[in-house]
Amino acid sequence: MGRRWGFLIGFLVAVGLLGLGHGEQQPSETAAQRCFCQVSGYLDDCTCDVETIDKFNNYRLFPRLQKLLESDYFRYYKVNLKRPCPFWNDINQCGRRDCAVKPCHSDEVPDGIKSASYKYSEEANNLIEECEQAERLGAVDESLSEETQKAVLQWTKHDDSSDNFCEVDDIQSPDAEYVDLLLNPERYTGYKGPDAWKIWNVIYEENCFKPQTIKRPLNPLASGQGKSEENTFYSWLEGLCVEKRAFYRLISGLHASINVHLSARYLLQDTWLEKKWGHNITEFQQRFDGILTEGEGPRRLKNLYFLYLIELRALSKVVPFFERPDFQLFTGNKDQDAENKMLLLEILHEIKSFPLHFDENSFFAGNKKEANKLKEDFRLHFRNISRIMDCVGCLKCRLWGKLQTQGLGTALKILFSEKLIANMPESGPSYEFHLTRQEIVSLFNAFGRISTSVKELENFRNLLQNIH
């Protein structure tokens, strides 16, 4: 009997040991876990968590924002895609059909948008146009009141001032054309390889406050990188002041957002009958899987959420500008313009209600002289990045790169103009702070792109859930 029990116990122990030996074959991580397991909880330098952003964006904000961006005021963007690259001459233009941009015919753009000046209210537009015409004729228009003349001069001065974070296009240039953003969506174009790497390499290596001795992880144009270089990079990054660290994270977040779009609207099928665009899971994994990217992918996605919070905060700060009664989304269609302003204000008030906004008061909060110097460096670095967009060889990528950098630049301009916004009069001309139509269109479309990225992350998370 004892021998039988001994045999049975031995058998059970053996089975147990076999089970332990196969412990490695327990259900492995899903692809979703490898991409998103670290993209949760609180974000660095923030008091907000990823889950709160997902819920707020995907269910309360995203649907209404998409409706607004489909309106005439926001779908037409004037851009000069023929500006020469200011940094190098050997640009390889992408010859693929999907890289091309189809500009609008003049009769496709609403008259109110095409008018000579469309930055402000209809009344202000007329006044500015009269002033510009008088200036061209070398005459003094005495019909304009002293207050109006002062306002016009302030507006003009402000547009040419040094507080802009972007190198903006001259929209009066004959090379500047209106583009319908809905007909030229941001998606995969096939523009990749050394030419695309060069753009991002210049942005990261020369414009993110990084010394040449610090090597960026997974840089395709650098060789012989290992774990020690990665550790050195993040030790350097954590040692930066909060402003410079935020700058890097904004650029990384923008890069990540663009890669999400390209993975979500990938050319899956191209036949003479039709083109089929959709989610490319493999492409997404190559860019964001924690194992395939040696831990970089999840970091990039967290930086995307950081970028979302920065632009969300800017929109909450600029609400008073859009609430002013003389501001309108002027296209010439009064009923539609009024409806769109109501929708715009609904969205902005929803944004203002977000409970965990980024606290920008920690920015530039030290010694005033040092803070001003740092702020100017911040502005000049970002302005330089906006100029690099003219070096992108794919015209559609250039279009969306210029729009999104101008949008982020406008968000930064808002965050650094808090006192000017607070001092705006409730009605009448605003001497110190205003936004041009170009800035408004780029601001909301850029945020729309980031909002779409956050929504697409939910889609990819669901698609990857059952893949190992």
Curated annotation (Swiss-Prot):
Keyword rRNA-binding listed: no
Modification after translation (UniProt): The Cys-94/Cys-99 and Cys-394/Cys-397 disulfide bonds constitute the redox-active center. The Cys-94/Cys-99 disulfide bond may accept electron from P4HB and funnel them to the active site disulfide Cys-394/Cys-397. The regulatory Cys-99/Cys-104 disulfide bond stabilizes the other regulatory bond Cys-94/Cys-131. Phosphorylated on Ser-145 by FAM20C in the Golgi which increases its enzymatic activity. Phosphorylation is induced by lactation. It is also induced by hypoxia and reductive stress.
UniProt subcellular location: Endoplasmic reticulum membrane; Golgi apparatus lumen; Secreted; Cell projection, Dendrite
Phosphoserine found at: S106, S143, S145
UniProt keyword annotations, A-Z: Apoptosis, Cell projection, Disulfide bond, Electron transport, Endoplasmic reticulum, FAD, Flavoprotein, Glycoprotein, Golgi apparatus, Membrane, Oxidoreductase, Phosphoprotein, Redox-active center, Secreted, Signal, Transport
Signal sequence, start to end: 1-23
CC annotations in GO: dendrite; endoplasmic reticulum; endoplasmic reticulum membrane; extracellular space; Golgi lumen
Disulfide bonds: C35-C48, C37-C46, C85-C391, C94-C99, C94-C131, C99-C104, C208-C241, C394-C397
Membrane topology: Peripheral membrane protein
Activity regulation: Enzyme activity is tightly regulated to prevent the accumulation of reactive oxygen species in the endoplasmic reticulum. Reversibly down-regulated by the formation of disulfide bonds between the active site Cys-94 and Cys-131, and between Cys-99 and Cys-104. Glutathione may be required to regulate its activity in the endoplasmic reticulum.
Enzyme Commission no: 1.8.4.-
Glycosylation sites: N280, N384
GO molecular function: FAD binding; oxidoreductase activity; protein-disulfide reductase activity; thiol oxidase activity
GO biological process: cell redox homeostasis; intrinsic apoptotic signaling pathway in response to endoplasmic reticulum stress; protein folding; protein folding in endoplasmic reticulum; release of sequestered calcium ion into cytosol; response to endoplasmic reticulum stress
Similarity comment: family membership: Belongs to the EROs family.
PANTHER family, per the entry: ERO1-LIKE PROTEIN ALPHA, ERO1-RELATED
Oligomer status and interactors: Predominantly monomer. May function both as a monomer and a homodimer. Interacts with PDILT. Interacts with ERP44; the interaction results in retention of ERO1A in the endoplasmic reticulum.
Annotated protein name in UniProt: ERO1-like protein alpha
Species annotation: Bos taurus
